[in-house]
Swiss-Prot record, chain A:
Described purpose of this protein according to its UniProt entry: Part of the dynactin complex that activates the molecular motor dynein for ultra-processive transport along microtubules.
SUPFAM superfamilies in UniProt: Trimeric LpxA-like enzymes
UniProt organism field: Caenorhabditis elegans
Alphabetically ordered keywords of this record: Cytoplasm, Cytoskeleton
Protein name in the entry: Dynactin subunit 6
Annotated compartments: Cytoplasm, Cytoskeleton
Amino acid sequence: MTETSTVSIASSAIVCVEADIKGEVIIKEGCVVHPFVVFDATKGPIYVGENNIFEEYAVIRNNSDGQPMIIGDWNIFQVHSKSSAKYVGSRNVIGVHAVLEDGCSVSDDCSVGAKCTVFSHQNLEPSVSVYAATNLSRTTKTPNMTSPHQIEFLRKILPSYHHLYGKKKAVATASASAAQ
Amino acid sequence: MSELLQYSRIKYECTCGKFRTLPDLVFCRYCFKIKCDDCSLGEVDNIFCPRCLEPSSVPEARLKKHKCASCNDCPKCANVLSARTENDNVYLVCQYCRWSSREANQEDQENTKSWPTKENPLVNQLGEVTAYMKRLELIENAPKDLKKGKSGKAWTAFHLKDKFGFQQMVDKRKKALAPEMNPVDAHAPTEAPTLEDEIKERTDDLRTLDQIIMQPLINISEPLLPVQVPLAGRVQVRCDECERTLIKRDFGVTTFKFKISSFARQFVPDIRMSRPVDDLKVGETSHVFLSITNLSSSAMDLTIAPQSGNGFIQCSSDPIQLLLPSSRASDTAAPGVHADQSDVIVFRQHNRVGLRLDVIPTEMDLSSPCLNLLITYCQDGSFRLSSASDKILKPEETCPDPILSANLKVDLR
Ligand SMILES: [Zn+2]
Ligand SMILES: [Zn+2]
Ligand SMILES: [Zn+2]
Ligand SMILES: [Zn+2]
């Protein structure tokens, strides 16, 4: 293993083996990464906080030149969403097929509706909702419902039906350290 | 679907002379005519909510102002609102744009039913005016009705069903035999708001036209309310000549089955383009590939005659006669010309035949090339038999079906 491809996954995080993780990626406690999620940190590191859910085919790609990409806690990246945002805060919901363009940033409690785009020059204030085909945005008083039940359920159920990334890696690092 | 199957490219001529795609046409077996939406009668046979599928009777729907009491749409993005419970009370939330009824300064309710809506502030005044106009109408019509000998007795059982609110009208007429005339006060004119006023009162969020149309009564200074879902009607189709039902769906709104269905597909040959047409060049012969399917329950004698001129593309192929077996007898070998014996017939497959027609476009055709075909077809008589199954036919009555013909427009673009 080279220095640039260090994947660090916390012990309580559930990362399916089908996830495609490249480069320096840190995933903290309690996160759930479904199969076929892509973390592409070949151009810069990706730091993921606690208790985030990454659904199937979500793509998290750092397109900056060496700048770290930071994702906070309790976010949900739904199916087929694409994120190249330099910063995503906490408790956000990124909808199905939503796109966060290069260099944009999302603060806390935001929601990006299905198929909506946050453009690269945009910095979403707290509690902003992006919706409709024309990417209307407004500040909302309604909080996102990120219930802890969903992530707890996923953490419990996923290991029974999927091979986990951590397990495979653990075996690989064990054999690597034995060879040293 | 019709785009996928390329139905939209071929238009059939209806009995009334209009051109429609085959799925839009119905067929009356009794009149033996093709009918389109313009020459048939539509009739609402069921009123229901498109969200919760709860059916309503006509008076019930009128009472509810044709809106569902329990379903609400988001006033911002028109998605479905879902209910969230908090402290035994519910409020409505849009999962898509995160609008909630709390943003409209609405108190949480005990249940999702009858969410408050904006009523017309002038509703009482309007009612008074309409009542007054009705009384005027009565007085004006009274001498005419007397002359005609109509004295309110001519009401039939049809009206007693009160499907269209006639009973109410009758009652009102009876009551209003000697209507009193109290002229309604004219609505006092109010000052029209100036542009400055409107700008001052306006909230920060501008509304789209769709949002305003969903709730036209709400002023720009007031917050938007949850939109009650308008009810939808299901239509049954009748023939305009014999008034027999041609299309009627099964009871219940959740079913997609038909009780009576008499679509033109079941009778008319189904003609489609089987391959896209190559680029048309002036003076050069191009091929148009058609597939013709007999979906009816009896064998069909069909003649296809290409028509030229009158703004249609020149077709050099001769008229072709085909005998198509029914879809039921599809495993018996098809009689008639075999594929390898004809230039025109490309393939033969059970109840389906592929044709190749040659067209020579001129300069004028290129902008909107259109091929005109005259089809003449005739079933072997079993169709008429099945339509007359409610009476016993004498042997001499079992004649072949009448010959029908229709023009076809094939869009070659
Ligand atoms: Zn018609
Ligand atoms: Zn409803
Ligand atoms: Zn909404
Ligand atoms: Zn008829």
